[in-house]
Amino acid sequence: MSLLAVDDIDAYYGESHILRGLSMAVEEGEICALLGRNGAGKTTTLRSVAGARPPDVRDGTVTFRGDDITQMATEDIAIRGVGLVPEERRVFPNLTVEENLHLSEVSRNASNTAGRDVGDLPETRPLSELYEAFPRLDERQNQLAGTLSGGEQQMLAIARALRQAPDLLMLDEPYEGLAPQIIDDVEDAIERINDEGTTILLIEQNAAAAISIADQCYIIDQGQVVFDGEAEELREDEETRKRYLGV
């Protein structure tokens, strides 16, 4: 059984039909890259998995560990172990790095107060583990998040999502706007997180960088899967890369 299975979903923004019978699966322990040109439906796919609205998922199912989560609230999906780092990062600029990381504890407590079952959740990941994964954040624990570089803010956004110890971490354009050296640092962190047991689903315009760390790749075009295979297969398939990714 796949950790995440998306089966034949149709998703809409209003009456705009974005995902058209899209199916994909993410296996536990892997790094899966979801690729495609701008407007192909990548972010819509992540939002559909995370329960964010819009889009409106009208047909098909999303299952996580065999449970149907298609119409669940975002908070309940997160409690089950699905984390999402959106493209906008959404760090709190007037709070320090450490205060941003502590917000995950507040989120967990709020869910408990709201009557959601958090009893089966793993404990929040210790800050020491996050600082080990992101040494730059360790050096800047007391620095305001708004004064961090773009790469450091991306690391903080990922670390904050990891604080909840998700089984599946979804990353929306983690390399956007980053210098090549910083991309290398973020890549190293993603691979380290994966080695420690967190499954990764990422979408990325920098196809070469994403393919270089992925185990499995999907390409979507106009809301449909047009390639599904191992990353090594896509590295060797120049025709498919040029046709759908322009690389």
Residue ranges and their predicted role:
Residues 35-37:
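The feature captures the beta-strand-to-loop junction immediately N-terminal to the Walker
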Residues 169-173:
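Catalytic Walker B motif of ABC-type/P-loop ATPase nucleotide-binding domains
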Residues 4-6, 19:
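Conserved structural motif at the start of ABC-family nucleotide-binding domains
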Residues 54, 95-125, 142, 247:
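ABC-type ATPase nucleotide-binding domains, specifically the catalytic core motifs of the NBD
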Residues 58-67, 80, 123-127:
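Conserved ABC transporter NBD signature motif
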Residues 161-162:
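ABC ATPase C-loop
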Residues 165:
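Conserved catalytic motifs of ABC-family nucleotide-binding domains
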